[in-house]
């Protein structure tokens, strides 16, 4: 009897079991040891297969697919260092909640620790970062199909957040054999193969910390007080819902760039530095934070220092999510569900002077950036580039801070990012996954080092299903470090690390469109044409290295001098 055939039977059951739990997309890297899994995925009509030659990018592609689809996404890689390349995406998923199923092919146990090629210790490789781990045995007909499918169903039922690592050892041979062999092993599951449900329908009742949110008994008391709403990362519908809810209460809403609330008080990173604005906020009796991953330095400083009578943090992700460790309540549930259970009561706004500080800060930004074609100016006017019925992917480091501080995105407009661990690795790959999951026109904006870090992911952008623009802000290095008190003598060499590159040849190498505009009207027209033309275009905006950081620092200083507004 053929080992290769039974390997494929085993893998086919594994993949079919995953589809019963909503897995629709699967990302595959090349490799021989993963052959049973790859062939099973290719043969399964319920799966959409995505391929990439770089496992690090592949993991981030899956991450982007999971972000935008809100579905679990599977990944197949071969044994050895291919597995380790999934680590960054796995870490990000653990922090931001996307469900990834990492199917890592492995050598059988007898080939580990004996000098066999491409054999490493894969069990436990990811330490505590996966939410769950399953180490499957080497496939053998002595193990029933019922055991395998039940094991997978149990693991998938428990996976509510983060990644599931399934290590899959396969012995050789991996190819050939009579496909009719071992049919009885698969047939032992009867009509399950024609069904659409899991073999084992396991219901997980979570511990009390994760129970669906009962209404906070004292909410009717606290909603009559002076409150402040902080909006972190959340979905588009949640952002719209929260904006209306806070407006009904008359509570000021300070929205992060990822909140999708429309940022009713824009330029918060600037006006929060004003001492009078801080005095107003200090009168809040309650602070309610929805979502995490706050971007603004000034907002984080105020969030750390504030001392309300009550501090509540609502987010569906587990964990404390409050680096300041406030005394209060950590409510683990979806933002929209919590808002529905805790209705607002129409009240007169209590901190109206904050709107005046916000308007003054925005006016200062407009005046300072008038006529400029700079990193800060692009961040400020970014909303003008967004496609209708599209989406935005925002990179990390300086650009996301500038957009947060100087821009104002439309309420409910989908915004995606990797702000869990906030790394610059895999940003282009993640953006590619976001676009593939939704098939929407997509604007992605990153810095030059981020683009260089994930340059081979340009291969993933060649076949976009809707128009896509990759906007690379080339400030020649990691200029985020210009905002930090890094030693000036060593800053360029050891922190910013300028590379003196342009991206024209990279775009040509991967058959992408390319443009390098020299003015804001030219950039705006180019982007507009891209939405009409289709395909993927890399647009490079070359800017002076430290101008963006210097402009932000200058504006913060200017806004602190705005005259006091009468309450």
UniProtKB/Swiss-Prot annotation:
Pathway: Quinol/quinone metabolism; 1,4-dihydroxy-2-naphthoate biosynthesis; 1,4-dihydroxy-2-naphthoate from chorismate: step 2/7; Quinol/quinone metabolism; menaquinone biosynthesis. It catalyses: isochorismate + 2-oxoglutarate + H(+) = 5-enolpyruvoyl-6-hydroxy-2-succinyl-cyclohex-3-ene-1-carboxylate + CO2. Its EC number is 2.2.1.9. Its cofactor is Mg(2+); Mn(2+); thiamine diphosphate. One of its GO terms (molecular function) is 2-succinyl-5-enolpyruvyl-6-hydroxy-3-cyclohexene-1-carboxylic-acid synthase activity. It is an enzyme of class 2 (transferase). Keywords: Magnesium, Manganese, Menaquinone biosynthesis, Metal-binding, Thiamine pyrophosphate, Transferase. InterPro entries: MenaQ_synth_MenD, MenD_middle, THDP-binding, Thiamin_PyroP_enz_TPP-bd_dom, TPP_enzyme_TPP-bd. GO terms for biological process: menaquinone biosynthetic process. CDD domains: TPP_PYR_MenD, TPP_SHCHC_synthase. Binds 1 thiamine pyrophosphate per subunit. Homodimer. Belongs to the TPP enzyme family. MenD subfamily. Catalyzes the thiamine diphosphate-dependent decarboxylation of 2-oxoglutarate and the subsequent addition of the resulting succinic semialdehyde-thiamine pyrophosphate anion to isochorismate to yield 2-succinyl-5-enolpyruvyl-6-hydroxy-3-cyclohexene-1-carboxylate (SEPHCHC). This is 2-succinyl-5-enolpyruvyl-6-hydroxy-3-cyclohexene-1-carboxylate synthase. It comes from Yersinia pestis (strain Pestoides F).
